[in-house]
A protein has these predicted regions:
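Conserved Rossmann-fold NAD(P)-dependent oxidoreductase catalytic core, especially the SDR/UDP-sugar
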Residues: 27, 85-130, 149
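Conserved beta-loop-beta element that borders a ligand/cofactor-binding pocket
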Residues: 103, 135-160
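N-terminal Rossmann NAD(P)H-binding glycine-rich loop of SDR-like oxidoreductase domains
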Residues: 2-22
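Glycine-rich "substrate-gating" loop/helix at the edge of Rossmann-like oxidoreductase active sites
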Residues: 154-164, 184-196, 220-222
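Mid/C-terminal beta-alpha module of Rossmann-like enzyme folds, strongest
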Residues: 2, 201-265, 292, 296-317
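A conserved pocket-lining segment of Rossmann-fold NAD(P)-dependent short-chain dehydrogenase/reductase
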Residues: 172-193, 210-212
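NAD(P)H-binding glycine-rich loop region in Rossmannoid oxidoreductase-like domains
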Residues: 34-94
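Conserved C-terminal active-site "lid" loop/helix of NAD(P)H-dependent oxidoreductases
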Residues: 255-290
Length: 317
């Protein structure tokens, strides 16, 4: 049994598709799980609660920790260490392997491309929390107490409307024939991971004995575009003019006075003011899975949006 903790997010949705394609028995765990045709089990559980987490993981061989919390430092500080501790303890009791899907906040602001060897040097409160929980898991598998791995992603974009920055600022807007936005600096390259690539790599990593007890960067296209180039690609696929505005720090700070999510994102703007380059060559060399090019990923994302519009589905934003 392969169990997804936090099954309702963008990565969980894509991972479910991949595991079902591989004909794996799957258990979906979330606070309010929805029945999905072909899924073996759905379990309602609060993974910040240890007994509920233990019960949700029981009988699993592989557990994917994909939880997404409200974008709030106070909530992260309170819940993330507890969730990681619960997942570790539950996997130990079930003799299950743990895959943690992580981001790059713990690296802080880096000049060189990010790799698995980039040291943790967080420059944000959220980054400090991510460094703490990643370190706790690394200590577990390095000491031989748990079979686990970390699969790390850059910022990502999603083939259907979700809350990733690229989707909210670019795809959602162009789908509604509106002007797009970009954060801080549109002239520097910014890596994005395409979520179907991430999901495929998670399933592949979990199925490979040689992948365990280490950190992997999931496949992400090389030679990332600048903000301006990314917007032009998206506009072309939506058949609109590449009109956009660059959101400055002062503007974002003022907007944060009226919007909690914007206020919480302010400390992460360092990721947008200079080059943000994410390398995944370790994965490619080990497994040969190539990442989807930006041109193809943007095209598929636009096509998914257009299909939703034809079906009468609403676009957020």
């Amino acid at each position: 049994m392969q169990t997804i903790l936090g099954a309702g997010g963008a990565i969980g949705t894509e991972l479910l598709k991949e595991l079902m394609r591989r004909q794996q028995p799957v258990r979906l765990v979330s606070r309010n799980p929805k029945e999905v045709q072909g899924v073996t089990e759905t379990v309602a559980a609060d993974i910040s609660n240890l007994p509920q987490t233990i019960a949700a993981v029981a009988g699993s061989t592989v557990v994917y920790l994909l939880a997404g919390l409200k974008y709030d430092t106070k909530i992260w500080h309170e819940l993330w260490p507890r969730i990681m501790s619960n997942a570790i303890e539950a996997c130990k009791r079930a003799n299950a392997k743990l895959v943690f899907f992580d981001n790059v906040y713990m690296y802080g602001k880096v000049v060189a491309p990010m790799t698995e060897e980039t040291p943790f040097n967080p420059c944000s409160k959220k980054g400090e929390i991510r460094a703490q929980i990643a370190t706790s898991l690394i200590n577990e598998f390095k000491s031989g107490k748990l079979c686990a791995m970390i699969a790390r992603s850059a910022d990502f974009y999603v083939p259907d409307p979700r809350t990733s920055v690229a989707n909210v600022l670019v795809f959602d807007k162009f789908a509604k024939k509106q002007k797009a936005s970009w954060l801080i600096n549109d002239a520097v390259p910014h890596s994005y991971t395409y979520t179907p690539d991430a999901a495929k790599s998670l399933a592949l990593l979990a199925d490979s004995e040689s992948a365990w007890n280490q950190t992997w960067h999931v496949p992400t296209a090389p030679n990332p575009p600048t903000g301006k180039e990314f917007i032009r690609m998206a506009a072309k696929e939506f058949g609109v003019e590449p009109k956009y505005r660059v959101l400055s720090r002062p503007l974002i700070k003022v907007a944060g006075l009226f919007d909690t999510d914007i206020r919480e994102s302010y400390e992460m703007l360092y990721q947008s003011d200079s080059a943000y380059v994410f390398h995944s060559s370790k994965f490619t060399k080990a497994f040969g899975q190539e990442s989807t090019s930006y041109a193809d990923g943007v095209r598929c994302t636009a096509l998914a949006y257009q299909a939703r519009l034809r079906a009468g589905a609403a676009i957020s934003g």
